[in-house]
């Protein structure tokens, strides 16, 4: 179970890093927001889901 938590945290850190770099680049590029809006919202939804799933799995370990 601890390995599952570690993998979830690794995914969360990876996705967070991608979003921290990607979102400002998309917002700074002219015309890119309209093209990438769905991708940014999908990434934010995945990030939120990962936070919730990680917290639920972590609560089962205690």
Curated annotation (Swiss-Prot):
Entry annotated with the keyword Transmembrane: yes
Entries under SUPFAM superfamilies matching the protein: PsbZ-like
Entry-linked InterPro entries: PSII_PsbZ, PSII_PsbZ_sf
One Pfam family cited in the UniProt record for this chain: Ycf9
Topology versus the membrane: Multi-pass membrane protein
One of the GO BP terms on file: photosystem II stabilization
A cellular-component GO term for this protein: chloroplast thylakoid membrane
Record's keyword annotation contains Membrane: yes
Subcellular location(s) of the protein: Plastid, Chloroplast thylakoid membrane
Keywords from the UniProt entry: Chloroplast, Membrane, Photosynthesis, Photosystem II, Plastid, Reaction center, Thylakoid, Transmembrane, Transmembrane helix
Residues that span the membrane, as ranges: 8-28, 41-61
Oligomeric form and interacting partners: PSII is composed of 1 copy each of membrane proteins PsbA, PsbB, PsbC, PsbD, PsbE, PsbF, PsbH, PsbI, PsbJ, PsbK, PsbL, PsbM, PsbT, PsbX, PsbY, PsbZ, Psb30/Ycf12, at least 3 peripheral proteins of the oxygen-evolving complex and a large number of cofactors. It forms dimeric complexes.
Protein family: Belongs to the PsbZ family.
Role summary: May control the interaction of photosystem II (PSII) cores with the light-harvesting antenna, regulates electron flow through the 2 photosystem reaction centers. PSII is a light-driven water plastoquinone oxidoreductase, using light energy to abstract electrons from H(2)O, generating a proton gradient subsequently used for ATP formation.
Name of the molecule in the record: Photosystem II reaction center protein Z
Gene symbol of the encoding locus: psbZ
